[in-house]
């Protein structure tokens, strides 16, 4: 049986009594975290559905926001392809020359290949005034066939002087409009009383095939379209699918294990991770001791446990002991782990987590110089013991390099300092899942300047981001704030510079102050958080900076949060615990490692700890 569409005119977009004090629909108990004040003012979101089974993808539905912002009534656009928005005025036949043809071609290619498109394009209202349309087109499949395309459109004013728009007489516009409307089938002349094909689908199909494919921000906007979609977007299971598709299965699994996650619900989790409204610093103390005292060790998180290995002791003595801090305990304290066959002592090395409870250490500076060996430790083994991995064709020995893990099985190492003192620019990969692991240098047509003290961060499925470090510039070395990315899913991966397109940073800066030995972590959705490290001048090392490399035009922004941050934070002493807590060890003096004091950055309300 066909479902009568509940049209926007019956939906109260003002929210009425259901609008919470913070301006979000429903507050903590509601389901649509969408700021009412921005609709349709500063950030109006249009919603368009086209029929992929008909030639030229004709529009079959637009929401009220689309009508208000563009000036086109629904009955004027139903049955047309949405490319008319690229023409200045309702009667112009050609695309305006200022519309980026490259973006148009990319969008056409995505539609033809049935893949998702994201981009920003110059569009025009009915009166000819320009506006920027940041849109996302998502193909909807049923039994492996694309049936519809869903478009979520974020409109903003375009500050472009195009001169007077082509005008028509006041009598001409209604006459042509009536002529166009009369050519439509009677059932399509008034969408508010007609039937929309998408609403003939069952709730299950809409939720699983359509809503679950959107981002948290998009689904929040979709919930404002009509009553039926409003009710569907209140379902916590729908939001879980949205978060899983956006953030990945592993991130979703980690969030599910956070204490209180079930109580708080996916709606609020999605909102807090998107807006960072609940992000806050907290200082806490732990028991136990790490003796002998040391610096330049490496820390890594395994679930709720923080592991430190090695470090530089008195008189530059390399250390090779292992300590664990269990933050899941009611009274966390540092404990020494008795392990057999420990690696040679070292500092300036990296310690990373691979599958489950396994840790991998690489390189560093030891008693007899630089190292390039690899050791694995299973923290949950009984008893735990280190095991050397004799990887074939290893990279040259190094220290102060950067590393990360991919897919839980692959170790990636980049840069660092060689025995000669020269800085390195190579990138190597070691697959630890192989029976006989072998190092492989990733061949690239171009490499960023050689550096040490930088960070490698994994985001998306198989992408890595490099930031900062002490980089070589001619015969000199300078702190860097450059950003480079590499997609390892490509047949021929290559480093690509990320250029900042403006920002909200003070003083008109396009990037955070240059630094090395800083902290860089990947947040759900692929955003990168940067802070800490060695920063020159009067710039604060504790200021948080956020970058989304997935954006078409990435731009840095400052993240201001509650609570008192640490004065210092170093990359080798900071780690993400449980996916929702960023723990900084020490951080008050920058020299003495007071490991009984720590700071944590809580990324969501439910992560508040009792320690």
From Swiss-Prot:
The modification S-4a-FMN cysteine is found at residue 82. GO terms for molecular function: photoreceptor activity. 'Adagio' means slowly in Italian. Weakly expressed in seedlings, root tips, stems, leaves, flowers, young siliques, sepals and seeds. Belongs to the ADAGIO family. Keywords: Biological rhythms, Chromophore, Cytoplasm, Flavoprotein, Flowering, FMN, Kelch repeat, Nucleus, Photoreceptor protein, Receptor, Repeat, Sensory transduction, Ubl conjugation pathway. It comes from Arabidopsis thaliana (Mouse-ear cress). This is Adagio protein 2. Changing residue 410 to R: No effect on the recruitment of ADO3 to the cytoplasm. Residues 196-242 form the F-box domain. Component of an E3 ubiquitin ligase complex that plays a central role in blue light-dependent circadian cycles. Acts as a blue light photoreceptor, due to the presence of FMN, that mediates light-regulated protein degradation of critical clock components by targeting them to the proteasome complex. The SCF(ADO2) E3 ubiquitin ligase complex is involved in the regulation of circadian clock-dependent processes including the transition to flowering time, hypocotyl elongation, cotyledons and leaf movement rhythms. APRR1/TOC1 and APRR5 seem to be substrates of the SCF(ADO2) complex. Disruption phenotype: Accumulation of ADO3 protein during the morning period but no effect on flowering time. The gene is ADO2. It comes from the Eukaryota. Kelch repeats lie at residues 293-343, 358-396, 397-446, 463-515, 527-579. Coiled coil: none annotated.
């Amino acid at each position: 049986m066909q479902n009568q569409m509940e049209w926007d005119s019956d939906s109260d977009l003002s929210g009425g009594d259901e609008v919470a004090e913070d301006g979000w629909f429903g507050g903590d108990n509601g389901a649509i975290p969408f700021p009412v004040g921005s609709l349709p003012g500063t950030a109006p979101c249009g919603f368009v559905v086209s029929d992929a089974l008909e030639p030229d993808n004709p529009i079959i539905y637009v929401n009220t926001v689309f009508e208000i912002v563009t000036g086109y009534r629904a009955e004027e656009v139903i049955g047309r392809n949405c490319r008319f928005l690229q023409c200045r005025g309702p009667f112009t036949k050609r695309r305006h020359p200022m519309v980026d043809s490259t973006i148009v071609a990319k969008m056409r290619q995505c539609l033809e290949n049935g893949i998702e498109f994201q981009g920003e394009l110059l569009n025009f209202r009915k009166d000819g005034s320009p506006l920027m349309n940041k849109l996302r087109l998502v193909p909807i499949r049923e039994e492996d066939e694309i049936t519809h395309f869903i478009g979520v459109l974020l409109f903003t004013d375009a500050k472009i002087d195009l001169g007077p728009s082509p005008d028509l007489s006041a009598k001409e516009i209604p006459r042509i409009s009536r002529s166009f409307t009369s050519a439509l089938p009677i059932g399509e002349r008034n969408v508010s009383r007609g039937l929309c094909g998408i609403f003939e689908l069952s709730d299950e199909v809409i939720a699983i095939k359509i809503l679950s494919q959107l981002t948290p921000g998009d689904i929040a906007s979709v919930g404002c379209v009509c009553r039926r979609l409003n009710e569907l977007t209140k379902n916590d299971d729908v939001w879980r699918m949205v978060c899983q598709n956006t953030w990945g299965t592993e991130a979703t699994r980690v969030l599910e294990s956070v204490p209180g996650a079930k109580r708080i619900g996916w709606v609020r989790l999605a909102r807090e991770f998107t807006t960072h409204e609940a992000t806050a610093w907290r200082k806490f103390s732990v028991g136990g001791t790490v003796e002998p005292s040391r610096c330049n060790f490496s820390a890594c998180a395994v679930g709720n446990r923080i592991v430190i290995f090695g470090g530089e002791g008195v008189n530059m003595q390399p250390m090779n002991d292992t300590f664990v801090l269990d933050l899941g305990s009611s009274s966390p304290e540092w404990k020494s782990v008795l392990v057999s066959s420990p690696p040679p002592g070292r500092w300036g090395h990296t310690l990373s987590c691979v599958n489950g409870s396994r840790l991998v250490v690489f390189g560093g500076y030891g008693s007899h110089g630089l190292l390039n060996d690899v050791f694995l430790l299973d923290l949950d083994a009984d008893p735990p013991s280190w095991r050397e991995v004799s990887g074939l064709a290893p990279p040259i020995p190094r220290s102060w390099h950067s590393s990360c893990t991919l897919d839980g099985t692959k170790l990636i190492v980049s840069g660092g300092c060689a025995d000669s003192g020269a800085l390195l620019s190579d990138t190597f990969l070691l697959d630890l899942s192989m029976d006989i692991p072998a190092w492989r240098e990733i061949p690239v047509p171009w490499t960023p300047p050689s550096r040490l003290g930088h960070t490698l961060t994994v985001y998306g499925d198989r992408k890595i981001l490099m930031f900062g470090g002490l980089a070589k510039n001619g015969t000199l070395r300078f702190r860097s704030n450059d950003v480079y990315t590499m997609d390892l899913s490509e047949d021929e991966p290559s480093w690509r510079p990320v250029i900042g397109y403006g920002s909200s940073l003070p003083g008109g800066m396009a990037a955070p102050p240059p630094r090395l030995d800083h902290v860089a972590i990947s947040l759900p959705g692929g955003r990168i958080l940067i802070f800490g490290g060695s920063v020159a001048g009067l710039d604060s090392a504790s200021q948080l900076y956020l970058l989304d490399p997935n954006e078409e035009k990435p731009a840095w922004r400052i993240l201001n949060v509650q609570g008192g941050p640490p004065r210092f934070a170093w990359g080798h002493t900071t780690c993400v615990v449980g996916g929702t807590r960023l723990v900084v060890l020490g951080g008050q003096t920058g020299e003495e490692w007071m490991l009984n004091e720590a700071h944590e950055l809580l990324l969501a309300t439910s992560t508040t700890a009792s320690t």
